[in-house]
């Protein structure tokens, strides 16, 4: 007698709608679901996937990174598309002329982009302007830049691990001896 195949792990984990209750985000999701289906373009499928992502996976993007990409040859006339917040960067001295499509732009970044003669458009305006994603460049923030990420990896204390330990205090007595100083057995 045969054994039935266990289907308990067959679930495909993917979001079919944003977790957020924000009606504008939900409308954008519907719009790009339509575009992805009808155009068959990879661009629209990526926008749709990122619209449904958690905030933790849509990390903020610095204005400096946007400026760096725009300054590259061939990108001057392209629209920068990002599904995260674009934040101002005080270290950036001069902002080039930028065409940006983003979910959210901070006040400081918005003022600097507009002052430089750039433009900021919404994602529904982008859908009208380039329904197939033509003349666009995709950007996203660094996902592994969170403080919590520093604690992930091989256990702190094993050779060649640079993982940050979870400690009560940063004092002399807390995970600062064996393996951290050559005078105490060894140093990684």
UniProtKB/Swiss-Prot annotation:
| Transmembrane stretches, start-end | none
Q: Where is this region: Disordered?
A: 143-188
Entry keyword set: Cytoplasm, Ribonucleoprotein, Ribosomal protein
The lineage's top-level taxon is Eukaryota
**InterPro entries assigned:** Ribosomal_eL18, Ribosomal_uL15/eL18, Ribosomal_uL15/eL18_sf
Gene Ontology BP annotations: translation
Give one GO molecular function term.
RNA binding
Signal peptide residues are none
Question: Can you say where in the cell this protein is located?
Answer: Cytoplasm
**Designated name of the protein:** Large ribosomal subunit protein eL18
């Amino acid at each position: 007698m045969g054994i039935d195949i266990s289907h308990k792990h067959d679930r495909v984990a993917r979001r079919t709608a944003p977790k957020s209750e924000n009606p504008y985000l939900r409308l954008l999701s519907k719009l790009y679901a339509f575009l992805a289906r009808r155009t068959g373009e990879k661009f629209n499928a990526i926008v749709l996937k990122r619209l449904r992502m958690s905030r933790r996976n849509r990390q903020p993007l610095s204005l400096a990174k946007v400026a760096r990409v725009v300054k590259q040859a061939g990108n001057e006339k392209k629209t920068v598309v990002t599904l995260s917040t674009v934040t101002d960067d005080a270290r950036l001295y001069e902002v080039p002329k930028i065409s940006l499509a983003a979910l959210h732009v901070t006040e400081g970044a918005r003022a600097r982009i507009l002052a430089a003669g750039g433009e900021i458009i919404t994602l529904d305006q982008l859908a009208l302007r380039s329904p197939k994603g033509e003349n666009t460049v995709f950007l996203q923030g660094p996902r592994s830049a969170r403080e919590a990420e520093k604690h992930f990896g091989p256990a702190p204390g094993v050779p060649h691990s640079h993982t940050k330990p979870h400690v009560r205090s940063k004092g002399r007595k807390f995970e600062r001896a064996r393996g951290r100083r050559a005078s105490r057995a060894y140093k990684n």
